[in-house]
Amino acid sequence: MKRTAWNIVFHSLIGLRARVLATSDPGLRGLEGVVVEETRHSLVVETRDGRRVRVLKANSIFLFQLPGGSWVVVRGEEIAGSLAERVKRLGRLKGVGWLVRAGEKRRYTRG
């Protein structure tokens, strides 16, 4: 199944370009790179200079670039837990995300 704004929380985030929009650690705001590891409570983002930085999912807001080029804003609480736990907790077709394409913001919900 293709990753979309509707179902991003039901997929592994490894390999997606990510940007930290907000987090409880002010030093991590604006961090951008590729997700190289995902745990129950954190994401490891590799920056352009090769640094690997662990960002807690709780109390964070992330921007992920989908394979098609569009961007989705996801709250850390929506992706908390392992992939199996997320699918079990949220159930199919309950994904929520902000789709941002060409500067346009809209709230998309389904379910």
From Swiss-Prot:
Location in or out of the cell: Cytoplasm
Annotated GO CC locations: cytoplasm; ribonuclease P complex
Predominant location: cytoplasm
Enzymatic reactions: Endonucleolytic cleavage of RNA, removing 5'-extranucleotides from tRNA precursor
EC number: 3.1.26.5
InterPro entries per the UniProt record, alphabetical: RNase_P/MRP_Rpp29_sf (IPR036980), RNP1 (IPR023538), Rof/RNase_P-like (IPR023534), Rpp29/RNP1 (IPR002730)
SUPFAM superfamilies found in the cross-reference section: Rof/RNase P subunit-like
Gene Ontology molecular function, alphabetical: ribonuclease P activity; RNA binding
GO biological process, one term: tRNA 5'-leader removal
Transmembrane domains' residue ranges: none
EC main group: hydrolase
Alphabetically ordered keywords of this record: Cytoplasm, Endonuclease, Hydrolase, Nuclease, tRNA processing
Function: Part of ribonuclease P, a protein complex that generates mature tRNA molecules by cleaving their 5'-ends.
Subunit field text: Consists of a catalytic RNA component and at least 4-5 protein subunits.
Family label: Belongs to the eukaryotic/archaeal RNase P protein component 1 family.
Protein name: Ribonuclease P protein component 1
Organism annotation: Hyperthermus butylicus (strain DSM 5456 / JCM 9403 / PLM1-5)
Lineage: Archaea, Thermoproteota, Thermoprotei, Desulfurococcales, Pyrodictiaceae
Gene: rnp1
